[in-house]
């Protein structure tokens, strides 16, 4: 199914397509293929439908170890596509300090520190010159705010004043700087599969991540990009079920190549 125009998305209210809504027009099926989750374009005054020369930005979203890097690597050698990986190396080394590791070990103390730097570095990702017609980004400034800052606050790890300041800064960025995106690809993975993959790749900072953390991140992603009950999405959303093994995931990426890389498929209805 092709995406509706961004203008029509702005006019529609988000509708539930999450688990538990079976029988409704937006309910999810149990198949392995992709599904389109209708979203409200936001902010609505950034409709670029008639800007034919605009370069396109696609954000690959998902939980920790959901397969984002694999997806980006799959498309990295495609002509006219550039890839921006999440700037994790920066988060691991700020003048010799590792705020990512500090946050995982003591989120109450270091949550604001890390998320302040994440917001800065993701802003840099969004605003750096784009050289190719299509840019694929690992996550976005939106998920930094709507998923990871939100999780710290809801979990009681971030004081309300820190949350308010980060939120106000984020809102100012969105109002005054072009950080718009054209499509969000959500790699929908169960926390149990993410936990298995996380343990297999054995990254140092991730050794202390509990299953409960992955469940919390998963719930927020579902609220944001599937149910539409958290925050409005920044762009239309393509959901790909991503619990499969590597071979199957590569097949799904190939099957969805045109949907992910072709702007015309994002702007016109079925």
From Swiss-Prot:
Annotated GO CC locations: mitochondrial inner membrane; mitochondrion
Catalytic reaction annotation: thymidine + ATP = dTMP + ADP + H(+); 2'-deoxycytidine + ATP = dCMP + ADP + H(+); 2'-deoxyuridine + ATP = dUMP + ADP + H(+)
Ranges of compositional bias, category Low complexity: 13-34
GO biological process: one example: mitochondrial DNA metabolic process
Transit sequence range: 1-38
Pfam family, one: dNK
EC number(s) recorded for this UniProt protein: 2.7.1.21, 2.7.1.74, 2.7.1.-
Binding annotation for ATP: 62-70
Domain of life from the UniProt record: Eukaryota
UniProt keywords, alphabetically: ATP-binding, DNA synthesis, Kinase, Mitochondrion, Nucleotide-binding, Transferase, Transit peptide
GO molecular function ontology, one term from the record: ATP binding
Intracellular or extracellular location(s): Mitochondrion
Region of interest called Disordered, as start-end residue ranges on this chain: 1-54
Major subcellular site: mitochondrion
Ranges of biased composition (kind: Basic and acidic residues): 42-54
Active site per the UniProt annotation: 138
Tissue expression from the record: Found in most tissues; highly expressed in liver.
Biological role stated in the UniProt entry: Phosphorylates thymidine, deoxycytidine, and deoxyuridine in the mitochondrial matrix. In non-replicating cells, where cytosolic dNTP synthesis is down-regulated, mtDNA synthesis depends solely on TK2 and DGUOK.
Subunit structure, interactors included: Homodimer.
Family: Belongs to the DCK/DGK family.
Official protein name in the record: Thymidine kinase 2, mitochondrial
Source organism of the structure: Mus musculus
The organism's taxonomic lineage, starting at the top: Eukaryota, Metazoa, Chordata, Craniata, Vertebrata
């Amino acid at each position: 199914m092709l995406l509706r125009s961004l203008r029509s998305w702005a006019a529609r209210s988000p509708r539930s397509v999450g688990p538990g809504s079976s029988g409704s027009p937006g309910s999810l099926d149990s198949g392995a293929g992709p599904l389109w989750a209708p979203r409200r374009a936001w902010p609505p005054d950034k409709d670029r439908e008639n800007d034919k020369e605009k370069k396109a930005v696609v954000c690959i979203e998902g939980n920790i170890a959901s397969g984002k890097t694999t997806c980006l690597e799959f498309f990295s050698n495609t002509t006219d596509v550039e890839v921006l990986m999440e700037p994790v190396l920066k988060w691991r080394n700020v003048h010799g300090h590792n705020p990512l590791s500090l946050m995982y070990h003591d989120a109450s103390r270091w949550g604001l520190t890390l998320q302040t730097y994440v917001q800065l570095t993701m802003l840099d990702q969004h605003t750096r010159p784009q050289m190719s017609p299509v840019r694929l980004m690992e996550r976005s400034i939106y998920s930094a705010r709507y998923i990871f800052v939100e999780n710290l606050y809801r979990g009681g790890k971030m004081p309300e004043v820190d949350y308010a300041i980060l939120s106000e800064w984020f809102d100012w960025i969105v109002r005054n700087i072009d950080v718009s995106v054209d499509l969000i690809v959500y790699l929908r993975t169960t926390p149990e599969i993410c936990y298995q993959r996380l343990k297999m790749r054995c990254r140092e900072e991730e050794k202390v991540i509990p299953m409960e953390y992955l469940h919390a991140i998963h719930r927020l992603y579902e609220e944001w990009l599937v149910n539409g009950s958290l925050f409005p999405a920044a762009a239309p959303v393509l959901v790909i079920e991503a619990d499969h093994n590597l071979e199957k995931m590569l097949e799904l990426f190939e099957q969805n190549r045109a949907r992910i890389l072709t702007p015309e498929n994002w702007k016109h209805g079925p």
